[in-house]
């Protein structure tokens, strides 16, 4: 008998599911055919919107809801080639839409390969900073909301154990190099054998920030059959080296900086101003006061300068909302600051180069660089925070007189020619007296100023381009006075390990290196000397004093003994000895030693030096290292050709060995993970067994038929069981019974407490 279905309810049977599945396969086959037939030379002109691309309906729907309609130049060139599954190396200006250029191919690749939540990690996106990783993840969730993939974000500053428990169930993983490398090494369930796509965003920045070891570790965990997409705003030798290691026959897309009209957006107005070092804060204060209705991003070279400038300007209150952002901030604070500045209409953000890459802050009016960037590429990325996606923007670069000539030459190579801006003395206001007052009143502010001073000089000292950065020409005393300090602090510059490597080093490993054999942390503090220790170390001021010994003539040596107590004295020294008086040290002391020495000499003389020979196919013996005659060498060919043949032969051998070594290393890592997984499984089983073996002890009270045989009156509310009073307590249920004949009956007391209670009751009665 058929069941009556509610109106509007859909029924899916097996035939309907089969029809839908076949329909999806036909659509994917048509899209794949369009991708294979795509020719960049002829079809690129006809592609102007996302709807013209061979992508699925769900992706188009997500793009439309996120208001992404038109394609940029880099997206036109890269997305169709990336959809074919080929490796790609894309270079374009900042703010040109590189994020969508790799997110769309990632989503489409997983759809065509029919990746589900049970297939594990299929796409990995690596970003240099946490803020950029968060931004990529937000865009991914917007355009991929109609797909059924699981995506995760892993960055520093979060709970590692929480991420480890869930990272194995992710299909798409976005994160920073350090945290991704940690999960690949430690997460037991994280498998990369099914990885389809690897994306390296801002690859040059990943290498510049000291993440080379982490990137190499990530590449070592991934299969070689993957597709790799590498994107950056600038190309460098390190990026090319990384491309050779991780990409296979890559398509290099994007116009190089030599052929471009300019490496910066055309809608960006660029200016520079020549400012002495001791007037930088005055110029910055005057600039902020004259642009209170603007959104300003200010770059410094160190986090200490950001902290000092933020605290002092916040105290002076310029009339605009001030914010700060640098690497040592906690992750929650960094995200909160990023969101506030993005939503603010008029604000000023003091930051380091942590926000110079990839972050899309909407409607930034001015980008001010208080400190000179380390190179032209850093300048391009800094000013790229403004004038994004065709909007207008302005940038201002402060240069010292010693930096002006060298920096402008390096910018001119990249077709960047900022205009000189002159500052009127009337509009410039000095805040040096206010800063001196703050540092005098507040020791914390003075300490911040000293640390900012030292950080700036160190940042200039470590720069590689000595033609631009000349630390010996910096006016230390006048700069310290401009910060409000009474004098220039002493600077200790330590050599050795790179600051970037120190910053990215694991703090757990550093703490572990300071422990002793027992695992306890060693401290550099010496043992505390008490007054009793000093008393026992005190020298006698009478008999053993130096003055007393000099007067009496009894000198004491270092061992505390008097020199007069010696019974032997030296009569002469350094005199010539006769050869007849010297003993013959070569003669053996005993007959056994003499016989042994003679037999060893005889054996060595008869054997000679050992030689090792090798035999050819004809049985002729040859030495291991046999020199070739000049005639035979000439017959073999030209020396250069022989050298090239030898190098090529060794290169092929090294390639084969490299593949073998990588496979062995991968198997070792997999075996380590399997062992760790087995240990965790056994621990869970032992915990379950212990829980099952726990015995529940039930204590039974005295039987009470009246209470046990009570019938339920139908109420759902259970009445609380009243505690039965003891025999010595008062009440109606007291076990004491008063009879009419004047006698009182009590149970026999068993303990001392019962006896004392009985006595108290009798006295009371």
Curated annotation (Swiss-Prot):
Keyword Nucleotide-binding: yes
Biased composition (Acidic residues): 744-756
Domain Helicase ATP-binding: 79-253
CDD domains with a match to the protein in the record: DEADc_DDX10, SF2_C_DEAD
Any matching Pfam family: DEAD
InterPro entries with a match to the protein in the record: DEAD/DEAH_box_helicase_dom, Helicase_ATP-bd, Helicase_C-like, P-loop_NTPase, RNA-helicase_DEAD-box_CS, RNA_helicase_DEAD_Q_motif, SPB4-like_CTE
Gene Ontology MF annotations: ATP binding; ATP hydrolysis activity; identical protein binding; RNA binding; RNA helicase activity
Residue sites binding ATP per the record: 92-99
Bias (Basic and acidic residues): 655-668, 720-738
GO biological process, one term: rRNA processing
Spans annotated as Disordered: 655-765
Chain span(s) of sequence motif DEAD box: 201-204
Predominant localisation class: nucleus
EC number(s) from the headed UniProt entry: 3.6.4.13
Placement of sequence motif Q motif: 48-76
Domain notes: The Q motif is unique to and characteristic of the DEAD box family of RNA helicases and controls ATP binding and hydrolysis.
Family recorded in the similarity comment: Belongs to the DEAD box helicase family. DDX10/DBP4 subfamily.
Function: ATP-dependent RNA helicase required for ribosome biogenesis. Involved in the release of U14 snoRNA in pre-ribosomal complexes. Required for pre-rRNA cleavage at site A2.
Protein name from the UniProt record: ATP-dependent RNA helicase DBP4
Naturally occurring in which organism (per UniProt): Candida albicans (strain SC5314 / ATCC MYA-2876) (Yeast)
Upper lineage: Eukaryota, Fungi, Dikarya, Ascomycota, Saccharomycotina
Gene: DBP4
